[in-house]
Amino acid sequence: GGSVDSAAAEEVFESNCASCHGADLSGAGPDLTQV
């Protein structure tokens, strides 16, 4: 179901993207707010 996929994607983001970009998207990684 979509909700399961969404939850999994959110979990992946939390553990991977956020670790680099920061939880508020202002971390050391590229600025994701402009994508």
Swiss-Prot record:
Molecular functions per Gene Ontology: electron transfer activity; heme binding; metal ion binding
Source superkingdom: Bacteria
Signal sequence, renumbered to the chain: none
Keywords assigned by UniProt, alphabetized: Electron transport, Heme, Iron, Metal-binding, Transport
Record InterPro entries: Cyt_c-like_dom, Cyt_c-like_dom_sf
Mod. after translation: Binds 1 heme c group covalently per subunit.
Coiled-coil stretches: none
Function: Monoheme cytochrome which functions as an electron carrier in the reduction of nitrite by membrane vesicles.
Listed name of the protein: Cytochrome c-550
Taxonomic path: Bacteria, Bacillati, Bacillota, Bacilli, Bacillales
